[in-house]
Amino acid sequence: MSERVDVEQHRADVARLLAGLADRPTEEVSVHQGALGRVLASDVVAPGPLPRFRNSQMDGFAVRAADVASAAPGVPVTLPVVGDVAAAPGEPAPLEPGTAVRIMTGAPVPDGADAVVPVEDTDHVTFNGARDEGARDNGVRGGGAHRDSATKVEIVRGRAAGEFVREPGSDVAEGAVVLRAGTVLAPHHVAAAAACGIAQLTVRVPVSVAVVSTGSELVAPDEEPGPGQIWDANGPALAAAVVAAGGQVGLRLAVPDDPEVVRTGLERAAALCDLVLTTGGVSQGAYEVVKDALPEVTFRSVAMQPGGPQGLGRVAGRPVLAFPGNPVSAQVSFVVFLRDLLRQAGGLPPVRQVPAALDAAIVSPAGKRQLLRGRWVDDAVAGARVAVVGGPGSHLVASMAAADVLIDVPAATTRLDEGAEVITWPL
């Protein structure tokens, strides 16, 4: 290693290297497909009011409020029913004074009507001369118990003007902001846009990352390893981490311990993606193939454990980050050095670090910042605390799988007692 730096220095250097990624282009996606999980690049503004027209909030009868003002149980108001209005295309005829129309939820309220009397506030409805003796009890709804046209209705409760009538713009006014820039689109956001008649959404183009695993010993998880071979955990893990941080995987490569093959693969990755991310071949062993293939990249030792060996620079003009090959080291490196930068480039906020109390005392070697795997535990007296999971080894993937957080122990700290406050990085 050519130099040794602390964690914050390396974080700052990585941030400078990747600063250009923050200026993301935009693209249009359809609300029908491809919008889920994308980040809005600009506010979404309603092109018109929602609802677009006056419509009924209930199944019932559209009336003039003045015509039913005196209605009460025992002294109903009887009105002729002059038609039906369904939630269907078309515009209903104006309502004449002293009449009613049967109306369905969402149907346009006729001009002249200023209130809707719910079915529950009617007692007897006559259908083509046949009297129904209890509309409230038998659940008469538009087109439900009776599909014939109603001719007369007895209303037992008056309704004030405006009751159960949805006015245009009462949900969303024309020109109102429906969705804010930076929103991560979920199904309910897509629904809001579609309901406003917005078919296309402007989203940020995610950072495209090439994930390159190095090592002749690696085989894919669906292959049978031979003697001395292991399954590649870093490729799938870091590809998933990239997507979880708002990026996209533009290329997945696994290359053997051959500097020329590695160099060719990385140049191909640089031509296709915004960022190249490698794992393995960056320490001080005899076969550190990434170091051999990239003499223009800075390799250094960062005062942290796990994840000390790191590299950063450019290949073919593209930024490249080189992480260690041990699985825990690679995942910790992603969380500490890259996750928030990818999120920022994608328009997402950083993952908030969380203070926590230790469940038990720990000791830590001086001189290296420790990032221990931890999980949340419940203490009946002290409440939620964080406990160390597994040992310090950078190969212990089971402990990483069981962890909820990384416990951050400063380099100068050699012991922390039970109950001591620590900073955690959520995984």
PLM feature spans:
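Short, low-complexity N-terminal leaders and the immediately following helix N-cap/first helix
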Residues: 1-75, 102, 128-146, 167, ...
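Helix-rich terminal scaffold detector
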Residues: 2-8, 199-323, 327-333, 344
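Structured loop/turn residues at beta-strand edges in well-structured enzyme cores
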Residues: 56, 96, 117, 271, ...
